[in-house]
């Protein structure tokens, strides 16, 4: 399936969105992945957009990378390779949002690379069913579906085939 590509240039910034729908033939689980690249120049950091972007999607798994590229100069001409404080991407995400997820950081401070992965803690099965009320399903079926969902999420989150 081919789609359209749209790139918008916003003055000194840009946002690019890539979508990846896919379907597993054995488990009947469908996933929809969205990659969003946000780049800014100047005083506005893309980190300030995280709460808005996370709130705009109903995401079960979130993977975020933040990289500081290049440098700027202070008023005396000294190069600044990091012009703001950061130890974790999580520092820029609302506490209420973080409470809904398990979050892990993998950062390379020397290279100004920051990586955070988040996995939803609670699964509301009704959100994953189409044209079916969760209570129409027998308890064992609900449990089996929830188990399949959780296994799929853990594999996507970890980036490896576990089950």
What is the meaning of each model-derived region?
Residues 1-163:
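Polybasic/polar functional segments that serve as interface/processing modules
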């Amino acid at each position: 399936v081919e789609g359209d590509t749209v790139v918008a240039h916003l003055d000194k910034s840009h946002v690019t969105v890539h979508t990846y729908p896919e379907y597993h033939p054995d488990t009947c689980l469908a996933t929809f992945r969205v990659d969003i690249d946000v780049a800014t120049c100047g005083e506005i950091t893309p980190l300030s957009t995280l709460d808005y972007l996370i709130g705009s999607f109903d995401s079960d798994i979130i993977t975020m990378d933040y990289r500081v590229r290049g440098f700027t100069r202070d008023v005396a001409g000294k190069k600044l390779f990091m012009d703001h404080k950061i130890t974790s991407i999580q520092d820029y995400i609302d506490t209420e949002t973080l409470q809904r997820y398990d979050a892990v950081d993998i950062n390379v401070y020397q290279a100004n690379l920051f990586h955070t992965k988040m996995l939803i803690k609670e699964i509301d099965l009704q959100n994953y069913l189409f044209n079916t009320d969760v209570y129409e399903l027998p308890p064992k079926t609900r449990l089996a579906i929830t188990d399949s969902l959780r296994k799929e999420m853990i594999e996507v989150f970890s980036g490896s085939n576990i089950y």
